[in-house]
Amino acid sequence: MGREYDGLSLPAAVPGIHHVTSITGDVQRNVDFYVGALGLRFVKKSINQDVPDTYHIYFGDYLGTPGTAMTFFGWPSWPKRRAGSGQVTTVGFTIPEGSFEFWVKRLRDLHIESSRATRFDGDVITIHDPDGIELDLVTGSSALKLTPWPDGPVPNEHAIHGFHSVTLTVAEAQASVDFLTKTMGFRQKAQDGRRTRFETGGGGPDSILDLVESPEGPAGEESIGTVHHVAWRAPDDKHQADWREKLIAAGRNVTPVIDRWYFKSIYYREPGGVLFEIATDSPGFTIDEKPGALGSGLSLPPWFQVRRDTLGETLTPIVIPTNLVQGRASSR
């Protein structure tokens, strides 16, 4: 599942992105966009375990493989988008080489505004999701071992191939640079003005972090249309425990290990204020649903099962798009 590990590089460096979690104000609209427009599979309908009367939903490849999982907290009562420093401000997805014009046309046909650019010698399409989160579609060749969604609205040869990168915006970059390179094992690869590119693990898509210094910008706040955190991969509990020790030794305030049922997590902030997580690859989303049924029902960890009836009445129903024809999807 995901990249193969040589067993020698951890905890010297995290191998890549595990998942990215953001905040949406309209879960149904969010599902319509990420499934119907971007062609990601809806792989899990669960709850935010810290605010259990709200959704935590997950998108990805057919299995939600680590390195593909874009997830959202459904918090409609939260304030609207307040993006700024101390946040992940852009999420990058990988699209296959040769798919650039396909995506330009697809987005135009779906009436989604986009812009085109070249960054570090790569072609980039920039769009925004319905809540305003900035997304990059970047051409590249990913080493992630994915399971394609055969029934998705995007042909497999053009489908999103997991994450490409995350962009962090910070008020002052040097402390973040030192932490990324000296503690987390990132390597600096390129620089363009205030943007510095780093990579980790085997390099390439799903391992890239761009750091943008913005001393004059406003501080970001947790709000609808912002990224809550980015999670980095650990192949197992042992590697995660090693990382926790290393981070504490580096002066980070790290949470205890938290069992999220689909993975185990530790959380901490890098010096620029961005919330990081290290999440285990296992057990994955098929722990409580078969692959073909992923996302079809409300999935709850065992310790929340006693609240299933109450939560089922509290949570607004989600309709998964099924009319996936000619690049369009409808849940209506």
Where are these regions (language model features)?
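A compositional/structural signature marking long, glycine- and acidic/polar-rich segments
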Residues: F198-I258
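Core segments of cupin and vicinal oxygen chelate
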Residues: I23-P66, D109, S115-A117, D121-H128, ...
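Peripheral, non-catalytic segments flanking oxidoreductase cores
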Residues: G2-G7, A69, F73-R82, G140-S141, ...
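Conserved donor-binding loop and adjoining core beta-sheet/short helix segment
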Residues: K44-Q49, F59-F93
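A structural feature that tracks compact, well-ordered secondary-structure segments
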Residues: G60, F73, L137-V138, L168-T169, ...
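Short beta-strand/turn micro-motifs at beta-sheet edges
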Residues: D6-S9, W78-R81, G152-P155, S214-E221
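Vicinal oxygen chelate
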Residues: M1-P11, P15-G25, S46, P76-A171, D192-D210, ...
